Regions:
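Generic recognition of stable, solvent-exposed alpha-helical segments in well-folded globular domains
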Residues: 17, 35, 39, 131-135, ...
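Long, hydrophobic N-terminal alpha-helical segment
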Residues: 5, 9-13, 134-152
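Stable alpha-helical structural segments in soluble proteins, enriched in small hydrophobic residues
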Residues: 96, 131, 135-146, 164-173
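A short beta-alpha structural unit
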Residues: 111-114, 152-163
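Condensing-enzyme catalytic core mediating Claisen C-C bond formation in acyl metabolism
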Residues: 2-8, 28, 33, 41-46, ...
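Glycine-rich, mobile lid/loop segments that gate access to catalytic sites or pores
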Residues: 2-81
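Short, surface-exposed acidic
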Residues: 31-39, 147-152, 177
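Short glycine/threonine-rich loop-to-helix capping motif typified by GTGT followed
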Residues: 120-124, 157-177
């Protein structure tokens, strides 16, 4: 139910929403044609490589080679520019736990969260996710971080149900151009 009910009534889907955001973002970045598929293919390989190492991941033990992205019989189009391997499988669940002993304790310096509309018509910009930007500003402010790109050892986890959201998220977090 993340798609606006009125837009859903006209056939809009989450992959369709992400596809439009991705198209706009790639256009803004001046990435066109086969270069878009090349970027998405590399992101797919990265995602599957990481997931293949996690025993709790849907694709545990199943990394994908670059050629798999371009296999038209197994990686069908979903919503341009997204193909099947750009989309996560339907699955639920997430958790984050930090366990440590006192001598090795780490301090979580900042945390931020935000929400925004899923409606394509109500978005201020199509090339970013405002909630990510807002949550990052809150977390950086709470942590006293003025220049996140200059931090060493920064750990970031982004929700990337669609491969194309990773570069968009890194830009929205202020970690990439």
């Amino acid at each position: 139910k993340t798609v606006d009910p009125e837009e859903r009534r006209f056939g809009f889907t989450m992959p369709g929403l992400i596809a439009l955001i991705s198209q706009a973002w790639f256009r803004k970045q001046r990435i066109r044609g086969k270069a878009v598929a090349d970027v998405l293919a590399r992101l797919m390989v990265r995602a599957h490589a990481l997931g293949s190492q996690n025993p709790l991941a849907a694709f545990y033990g199943r990394p994908e080679p670059l050629e798999a992205y371009f296999d038209a019989t197994k990686n069908l189009p979903v919503a341009t520019p997204l193909r099947r391997k750009d989309c996560s499988p339907i699955c639920d669940g997430a958790a984050a736990v930090i366990l440590t002993s006192r001598p090795q304790a780490v301090r979580i310096a900042g945390l931020g969260s935000a929400t925004e509309t899923a409606s394509i018509l109500d978005r201020a910009q199509l090339t970013c996710l405002d909630a990510t930007r807002h949550a990052a500003r809150i977390a950086y402010w709470r942590a006293g971080i003025a220049k996140p790109r200059e931090l060493e050892g920064l750990v970031v986890e982004l929700h990337d149900a669609f491969n194309s959201l990773l570069p968009i998220g890194l830009v929205d977090l202020g970690l990439a151009d």
